[in-house]
Amino acid sequence: MIRFILLQNRQGKTRLAKYYVPLEESEKHKVEYEVHRLVVNRDAKFTNFVEFRTHKVIYRRYAGLFFSVCVDITDNELAYLESIHLFVEILDHFFSNVCELDLVFNFHKVYLILDEFILAGELQETSKRAIIERMSELEKLQ
Protein backbone atom coordinates (compact mmCIF):
# COMPACT_ATOMS: atom_id res chain seq x y z
CA MET A 1 0.00 0.00 0.00
CA ILE A 2 1.15 3.51 -0.76
CA ARG A 3 1.62 5.62 2.38
CA PHE A 4 2.26 8.92 0.62
CA ILE A 5 3.43 10.53 -2.60
CA LEU A 6 5.69 13.58 -2.61
CA LEU A 7 6.91 15.79 -5.43
CA GLN A 8 9.76 17.98 -4.21
CA ASN A 9 12.29 20.24 -5.87
CA ARG A 10 16.02 20.20 -5.14
CA GLN A 11 15.63 22.88 -2.47
CA GLY A 12 13.16 20.74 -0.54
CA LYS A 13 9.98 22.63 -1.40
CA THR A 14 7.10 20.21 -1.62
CA ARG A 15 5.14 20.83 -4.80
CA LEU A 16 2.62 18.03 -4.34
CA ALA A 17 1.84 15.85 -1.34
CA LYS A 18 -0.80 13.16 -1.18
CA TYR A 19 -1.13 11.10 2.00
CA TYR A 20 -3.07 7.85 2.12
CA VAL A 21 -2.59 7.34 5.86
CA PRO A 22 -3.58 9.84 8.54
CA LEU A 23 -0.69 11.92 9.88
CA GLU A 24 -0.56 15.02 12.06
CA GLU A 25 0.44 18.22 10.27
CA SER A 26 3.73 18.39 12.19
CA GLU A 27 4.48 14.76 11.31
CA LYS A 28 3.84 15.50 7.62
CA HIS A 29 6.41 18.30 7.66
CA LYS A 30 8.88 16.04 9.43
CA VAL A 31 8.32 13.26 6.88
CA GLU A 32 8.74 15.67 3.95
CA TYR A 33 12.01 16.97 5.40
CA GLU A 34 13.37 13.47 6.08
CA VAL A 35 12.42 12.11 2.66
CA HIS A 36 14.03 15.08 0.94
CA ARG A 37 17.21 14.58 2.97
CA LEU A 38 17.23 10.90 2.00
CA VAL A 39 16.85 11.30 -1.75
CA VAL A 40 18.52 14.59 -2.65
CA ASN A 41 22.06 13.54 -1.74
CA ARG A 42 21.97 10.01 -3.15
CA ASP A 43 24.37 9.32 -5.98
CA ALA A 44 22.80 8.55 -9.37
CA LYS A 45 24.51 5.14 -9.45
CA PHE A 46 22.63 3.99 -6.33
CA THR A 47 19.26 2.25 -6.55
CA ASN A 48 16.06 4.26 -6.47
CA PHE A 49 14.85 2.38 -3.39
CA VAL A 50 15.73 3.39 0.15
CA GLU A 51 14.45 2.19 3.52
CA PHE A 52 12.53 4.80 5.47
CA ARG A 53 11.47 3.99 9.02
CA THR A 54 9.46 0.75 8.70
CA HIS A 55 8.66 1.35 5.01
CA LYS A 56 10.58 2.09 1.86
CA VAL A 57 10.73 5.08 -0.41
CA ILE A 58 10.90 4.63 -4.16
CA TYR A 59 11.95 7.79 -5.94
CA ARG A 60 12.88 9.07 -9.35
CA ARG A 61 14.40 12.37 -10.36
CA TYR A 62 13.12 14.21 -13.41
CA ALA A 63 15.00 17.46 -14.10
CA GLY A 64 14.83 19.35 -10.80
CA LEU A 65 11.96 17.38 -9.27
CA PHE A 66 12.02 14.30 -7.08
CA PHE A 67 8.97 12.04 -7.32
CA SER A 68 8.89 9.94 -4.13
CA VAL A 69 6.47 7.18 -3.16
CA CYS A 70 6.50 5.58 0.29
CA VAL A 71 5.21 2.00 0.33
CA ASP A 72 5.10 -1.04 2.59
CA ILE A 73 8.38 -2.89 2.94
CA THR A 74 6.98 -5.98 1.16
CA ASP A 75 5.62 -4.15 -1.92
CA ASN A 76 7.13 -4.50 -5.40
CA GLU A 77 9.58 -1.64 -5.95
CA LEU A 78 9.63 -1.93 -9.73
CA ALA A 79 5.86 -1.61 -10.01
CA TYR A 80 5.97 1.69 -8.16
CA LEU A 81 9.03 2.90 -10.06
CA GLU A 82 7.09 2.31 -13.28
CA SER A 83 4.00 4.03 -11.84
CA ILE A 84 6.13 7.14 -11.21
CA HIS A 85 7.22 7.03 -14.85
CA LEU A 86 3.60 6.57 -15.98
CA PHE A 87 2.59 9.61 -13.91
CA VAL A 88 5.31 11.72 -15.53
CA GLU A 89 4.35 10.53 -19.03
CA ILE A 90 0.73 11.53 -18.41
CA LEU A 91 1.79 14.90 -17.01
CA ASP A 92 3.95 15.41 -20.12
CA HIS A 93 0.94 14.64 -22.29
CA PHE A 94 -1.25 17.27 -20.61
CA PHE A 95 1.36 19.96 -20.03
CA SER A 96 3.64 19.42 -23.07
CA ASN A 97 6.94 18.73 -21.32
CA VAL A 98 5.88 19.29 -17.72
CA CYS A 99 7.90 21.59 -15.47
CA GLU A 100 7.73 22.64 -11.84
CA LEU A 101 5.59 25.69 -12.59
CA ASP A 102 2.97 23.50 -14.28
CA LEU A 103 2.62 21.60 -11.00
CA VAL A 104 2.32 24.81 -8.99
CA PHE A 105 -0.23 26.58 -11.17
CA ASN A 106 -2.26 23.52 -12.18
CA PHE A 107 -2.15 21.55 -8.95
CA HIS A 108 -5.86 20.71 -9.17
CA LYS A 109 -5.34 18.96 -12.51
CA VAL A 110 -2.26 17.13 -11.18
CA TYR A 111 -4.28 15.79 -8.24
CA LEU A 112 -7.04 14.70 -10.65
CA ILE A 113 -4.53 12.77 -12.74
CA LEU A 114 -3.10 11.15 -9.63
CA ASP A 115 -6.57 10.18 -8.43
CA GLU A 116 -7.29 8.53 -11.79
CA PHE A 117 -4.75 5.78 -11.23
CA ILE A 118 -4.23 5.57 -7.47
CA LEU A 119 -7.21 4.89 -5.24
CA ALA A 120 -6.94 4.63 -1.45
CA GLY A 121 -3.21 3.97 -1.65
CA GLU A 122 -3.40 1.20 -4.26
CA LEU A 123 -2.59 1.26 -7.97
CA GLN A 124 -5.91 0.96 -9.81
CA GLU A 125 -5.25 1.89 -13.42
CA THR A 126 -2.01 1.33 -15.30
CA SER A 127 -3.18 2.09 -18.81
CA LYS A 128 -1.90 5.44 -20.01
CA ARG A 129 -4.51 5.51 -22.77
CA ALA A 130 -7.41 4.90 -20.36
CA ILE A 131 -6.25 7.62 -17.98
CA ILE A 132 -5.77 10.14 -20.79
CA GLU A 133 -9.23 9.33 -22.19
CA ARG A 134 -10.85 9.84 -18.77
CA MET A 135 -9.02 13.11 -18.24
CA SER A 136 -10.08 14.31 -21.69
CA GLU A 137 -13.70 13.53 -20.81
CA LEU A 138 -13.36 15.50 -17.58
CA GLU A 139 -11.90 18.47 -19.47
CA LYS A 140 -14.91 18.47 -21.80
CA LEU A 141 -17.19 18.90 -18.78
CA GLN A 142 -15.39 22.03 -17.59
Swiss-Prot record:
**A Gene Ontology molecular-function term?**
clathrin adaptor activity
Give the way it sits in the membrane.
Peripheral membrane protein
Q: Which Pfam families match?
A: Clat_adaptor_s
Claim: Oxidoreductase is one of the keywords in the record: no
Q: Where in the cell is it found?
A: Cell membrane; Membrane, Coated pit
Q: Which residues form the signal peptide?
A: none
Q: Which InterPro entries match?
A: AP_complex_ssu, AP_mu_sigma_su, APS2, Longin-like_dom_sf
Q: What is its main location?
A: membrane
A GO term from the CC aspect: AP-2 adaptor complex
Alphabetically list the UniProt keywords. Cell membrane, Coated pit, Endocytosis, Membrane, Protein transport, Transport
Gene Ontology biological process terms in this record: clathrin-dependent endocytosis; protein transport
Describe its function: Subunit of the adaptor protein complex 2 (AP-2). Adaptor protein complexes function in protein transport via transport vesicles in different membrane traffic pathways. Adaptor protein complexes are vesicle coat components and appear to be involved in cargo selection and vesicle formation. AP-2 is involved in clathrin-dependent endocytosis in which cargo proteins are incorporated into vesicles surrounded by clathrin (clathrin-coated vesicles, CCVs) which are destined for fusion with the early endosome. The complex binds polyphosphoinositides.
Q: Which family does it belong to?
A: Belongs to the adaptor complexes small subunit family.
The record's subunit annotation is: Adaptor protein complex 2 (AP-2) is a heterotetramer composed of two large adaptins (alpha-type and beta-type subunits), a medium adaptin (mu-type subunit) and a small adaptin (sigma-type subunit).
Under which name does UniProt file this protein?
Answer: AP-2 complex subunit sigma
Source species, please? Arabidopsis thaliana (Mouse-ear cress)
